[in-house]
Amino acid sequence: MEKWWFNSMLFNRKLEYRCELSKSMDSLGPIENTSLREDPKILTDIEKKIHRDLDYLEMEGFFSSDLNTVSKNDDDHYMYETQFSFNNNITSFIDSCIESFNLGDIDKYNDIYFYSYIFLKGRNCSESDNSSTSIITSTNDTNDSDSTIGESSNNLDESQKYKHLWLECENCYGLNYKKFFKSKMNICEYCGYHLKMGSSDRIELLIDSGTWNPMDEDMVSLDPIEFHSEEEPYKDRIDSYQRKTGLTEAVQTGTGQLNGIPVAIGIMDFQFMGGSMGSAVGEKITRLVEYATNQLLPLILVCASGGARMQEGSLSLIQMAKISSALYDYQKNKKLFYVSILTSPTTGGVTASFGMLGDIIIAEPNAYIAFAGKRVIEQTLNKAVPEGSQAAEYLFHKGLFDSIVPRNLLKGVLSELFQFHNFFSLTKNDKA
């Protein structure tokens, strides 16, 4: 009689617990990550698996209690210990089940699969370790450090594996697919930030197809002062950048047509030694200005530079005066039209010379424009530079240049400027 009463009570308690567990499982979705509700099939599979194992555990616990009742029915704490053990088994099973369906992995089946998987997981691996809703790590404390290190290493490997497919935005850290990035003019598709653009890409952006004629392509820098460096000789560094970029120097100069209008254009490339201005760069720009003067062409100079090239000493500094002198003859004596375009970054000797001498000065959005960089100013004056004080938008409101023009509108704006200054298209159908 006592055995029947005990088993009946135990069965009722377990049945009651089963009902409560089922109710809690029904509300698991909204309590945890809401992304689970996006795939009801996954949730249904989880519930089926849990209920199947619950049935097995209940039967096993029920029969084991029958076998042990004779020896333990006098123990007042037996019912409590049995249910406590049963609770532990259920809790452990639920934990392992949730771990197998990593909530961070479920989010990867969104439209931006690679964005969440490759970038967010790789870049924010330290943050995801602290987020229980993103990744549920092992409950075994002794293995926490090892699992974290292993996960971080795997995330880094994944980021490197797909690095050639994506370009990270400097502003919002969004990932832009490289295959389509060029067609978007190197503008972030998430926040509209203008990322750095190579000189060859800018030529394609501004100059009509098939009209580009480069000048002084064979002009290269030597080592005029035999600059000594413990890390890498100056000549070797030049050779390295030439192989890396496919350019001979940090500027490309030439002539072409912009919506049918003949122009002389020079475009600096920050990828080549930070766009630094050495003797070869200064000579190429000076020759371009002189050619535009003789041919009566409108002139465009696109600036992207860290300033004078220190490896050439005073020879790099004299380029500032040489280019400015050629521009004086072009603007003052010939009354021709020069447009300066400031991109990010434009600093140092370029800002102090031809960068600010344009008849019209245009800046790209968010461009970093300064004479001395933020770090140099803070180290020299021991004062903090206000945030954004060297950004194009702030400087525009202070009157430093004429307009901020987005990259996708730049060609049309230049075309209208040239037409306004009596430079007209050679073709019959002018492109808008």
From Swiss-Prot:
UniProt enzyme class: transferase
Main location as per UniProt: plastid
Region (Disordered): 127-154
GO cellular component annotations of the record: acetyl-CoA carboxylase complex; chloroplast stroma
Catalysed reactions listed for this entry: N(6)-carboxybiotinyl-L-lysyl-[protein] + acetyl-CoA = N(6)-biotinyl-L-lysyl-[protein] + malonyl-CoA
Biased composition (Low complexity): 128-149
EC nos: 2.1.3.15
A biological process from GO: malonyl-CoA biosynthetic process
Pfam families: Carboxyl_trans
CoA carboxyltransferase N-terminal domain: residues covered: 165-432
Function as written in the Swiss-Prot or TrEMBL entry: Component of the acetyl coenzyme A carboxylase (ACC) complex. Biotin carboxylase (BC) catalyzes the carboxylation of biotin on its carrier protein (BCCP) and then the CO(2) group is transferred by the transcarboxylase to acetyl-CoA to form malonyl-CoA.
Subunit annotation: Acetyl-CoA carboxylase is a heterohexamer composed of biotin carboxyl carrier protein, biotin carboxylase and 2 subunits each of ACCase subunit alpha and ACCase plastid-coded subunit beta (accD).
Similarity-based family: Belongs to the AccD/PCCB family.
PANTHER family tied to this protein: ACETYL-COENZYME A CARBOXYLASE CARBOXYL TRANSFERASE SUBUNIT BETA, CHLOROPLASTIC (PTHR42995:SF5)
Name this polypeptide is given: Acetyl-coenzyme A carboxylase carboxyl transferase subunit beta, chloroplastic
Organism (species): Glycine max (Soybean)
